[in-house]
Each structure stands twice: as structure tokens, then as C-alpha cells.
Amino acid sequence: MKKQKGYLVFDIGTGNARVAVVSVTGSVLTVEREDIEYSTETLYPDSRYFSPQVLWKQVMNLAKRALSRSCDIDIIGLTSTSQRQGIVLIDQNGNPFLGLPNIDNRGREWEAGIPDWEEIYSSTGRLPTALFSALKLYGLKQRQPSLWEKTASFTSISDWVTYQLSGILTYEPSQATETLLFDVKQNTWSEEMCDIFGFSPSILPPLVRAGTAIGTIANEYASELGLSINAKVIAGGGDTQLAVKSTGAGLEDIVIVSGTTTPITKITEDHGDTKHKAWLNCHTDQGHWLVETNPGITGLNYQKLKQIFYPNETYEVMEEEISALAKEDHACVAALGSYLSAEKNALTRGGFLFDAPLSAHLKRAHFVRAALEEIAFSIKWNFDILTEVTPFERDYVWVCGGGFQSKALTQYIADLLQKKVYVQEGYHQASVVGAAVICNETFQLTEEMSANVRVIEPKDCQIELALYEEWKQTQRFFSGSESKVLI
């Protein structure tokens, strides 16, 4: 029997690393995952890092496990996707030696001292905050000069994976967008941005578009994984861009991706002024951009609350208990992030507001539902900002990502936005499926991927809109000052 063709996809998220085997038809056949081990760098108030050597050993073991469960697949290509903003530093000998994830904020102390904010925004499509890679490097240079001197180059986490597999160092534009060193409108590295941050352009790898066959798998890893030495290593892209790609959404569509954060994106051919209210990103499709608003950390908060309130239960149990609550029974309101602030992922005070003394009817489900509603409210807030920047008249939005495994969240979005919600089959593994889509384009395969789309219709939302207003007041309460809140 002839083996089915497929791909080995590495997906390095914020919370965990995954390796999947995906068929050319987009079916995710096996997925293996483990949490990523981060360490804290005490030289900074808010810093995380990881060991590339430890993570590489981890993902190779995941790859072996995934392949062992997919014996009837002929792997013709390998690719990768990852969290955006995260980077891996490489020394003069070509050895990766330090990983800085998206949640590393070591550059925050120097944000205010960065000059030429308007020039940076005009060129890169974002303001210089600690979220982006250049500020991570800048903080390293200021406080850990010995590590900076050791740095010959750096690349995104997804491009680090393809570097490991092929031995060829590249940077893909949808990831380069997140560095603050990339001219997003011209799709090229910016020497002017390097000058602003005091970096030599020599640290920047060659740019390679998503879907480019970089090379073939190194003999060492072909042998270790039991793959053909002819298997191609293909440039991947940012997890948001590949998730958007998986939906099949077209120009001018809006796609909401619910994961660690929740990007709300519009696909466009235009790279006009985003008025300091949105980011402008390269898409994996040449000539297309994504205009994005993003509330910051969302799904990661929900995951942590599960660990607190439902440590031994599944998400399905959480969903059942949430659905058992009366629609009008809102015993508490959540404020778990600076969702109305211009600064994403900033450290802030937060919590839940509820009546005191505690009601005998207050249950754990009230807290997790409040957190889920907050994700929906933060999406509405950012959706409204996005549609101010770039008008949107369609009666639907696309959604994807693991967060939309919650039927409650999906219905909240339909109700609050008063839009139909389109959910493509495979939505919960969107970045992995999107990786298979770009690989198919590389191999010029025309296999039909699933076109099964579920449609969620909006319902009356008067209760939700009233709660939305209450949530905004709760955000004000925890912000401590209305001047910090964009409302």
C-alpha cells in the first residue's frame, strides 16, 4: 500500500512545544507536546529565558514520539512555526546559546529612552516596547555586555528550528516584523532602525519568504528521526500568520486567533496609517499584510485559572459547569490584564470583583466564566479599535485557535460583535494546519483540504453588553487611574 505524504511540523508556543505529523490534506494525524522550561533572569525586574540546547533535545524527543505513531506517512517536508517576538541568540561559531521568549521583558527599563518613536512606528508598524525583539537585545546589551559580545546573530524561534534542521540560518518576514529592525512596508531589514538601537546590521540573517525550501534535512537528524535525506526543510512563519492561513480567509476578512494572546487581524493589500492604534504585520502571502489589534495575555490566564480551580478536571468539565450557570447569574467580574491599556503584557494589579460578604452561591465556575467573558470583552474592545482603523462591513468573522474549543467563548464573540462566526475544521490546531498549507504551496500540491465550516449565528446580546460596560468599570477600578486606560 502506498504511503500517504505528509509533513513534520514543529510548533513552539509560549506555554508548550508541540510536534505534529500532518497529511497533505491538512489532517493532523499525531501531536506530541510538553511544557517549555523557562528560567528567571534576576538582573531584570521581569525577564525569562530558555536554553536552546534543552529545548532542542525536548522537541527532538517529541518528534520521535510523533513519528512513531505515524508509521504509514512519508514525510516529504519539515517546517516550523512559533510564538512571535521570541528569539534565539547565536554565537560566532554558529552555536545557539540563549533563548528569549515573547514573555521576556528585560528591555522595559529602557523603553522611555529609545529615541525617534514616530520614525520607528512609521517604519516598523509598531511602537518600541519590551514585547519586541530589539528591546530584548537592547536590555541584554545594557546589563549583560558579555552575552552581547558573544552574539554574532539571532533569529526567530521558528527560524532557529529550521536552522537546526538544515544548518542554514534565515529569518522569515512575518517573524522579522516583530524585531523593530524590519521595514514592514518595504519587506526588508532597516539600517536606520539598527542605527537607532545601536546594532550592526551584520547580526541580521538573510530574509527568506515563508514556503521557501531552504535545503534538505541534515544527515544527522535524518538518521535520528528515520527520515529520507531528501526531505525538504521549508521556511515557516509566525504562529498568528499561519493560523490565519489555515482558515482560508480572503482579502479584507477579519480573523481572530485565540491562543496565549488573542490577535484580531484583518488581511489587506494596503499598508496605510494605523494611527498608533494597531500593528502592521507582514503576512506569509507576499503582497499581503495583517492589520492587528491584540489585548495581550488572554488564554494563558485561562490556563492558569484551570490549574487553580480545576487541577484534575478537563476543560470539558469547566465548560459544563459554566453552561450550568444561569445566564443572569454573574456573581463576579474579572480584571486579569491591562486590556484597555496601550501597553500590552505590562505588570499590573488585577483580580475579581464580587459582593462581600461572600455569597453561599459563589462557585468556582463563576470565576472561570468571568475570565472567559473577559477574553470575549477584550476581543470586542480590540475589534472595535481595529474597525476604526480599517473599516469592516462584512457580516462574519473567522475564528481559530485552541481558545475557541470553548463553545461559550465562540457564542460570546458572535453575540458581542453581532457577526456570524465561521469556524473551519482543524481550527484548534490552526498554526499546524497553516504550516501544511504553505508546504503544499511549496510542493505545488493541489490536494483538497477540508472545506467544512461551522457557522455560529449571533443572538440577543443585551445582557452581555451590560456586562461589557461593567467590565470596563472594573478595568478602571484596578488601573487606579483613568489616565492609564484608553476609554
UniProtKB/Swiss-Prot annotation:
Any one Gene Ontology biological process term?
Answer: carbohydrate metabolic process
Q: Record's superkingdom? A: Bacteria
Q: What is its EC number?
A: 2.7.1.-
Q: Which GO terms describe its molecular function?
A: kinase activity
* Xref: CDD domains: ASKHA_NBD_FGGY_YoaC-like (cd07798)
What induces this protein's gene, according to its Swiss-Prot or TrEMBL record? Answer: Induced by sulfate, part of the yoaDCB operon.
Pfam families found in the cross-reference section: FGGY_C, FGGY_N
Q: Which UniProt keywords apply?
A: Kinase, Transferase
- Give the UniProt family note: Belongs to the FGGY kinase family.
What's the protein name? Answer: Putative sugar kinase YoaC
Native source organism of the sequence: Bacillus subtilis (strain 168)
- What is this organism's lineage? Bacteria, Bacillati, Bacillota, Bacilli, Bacillales
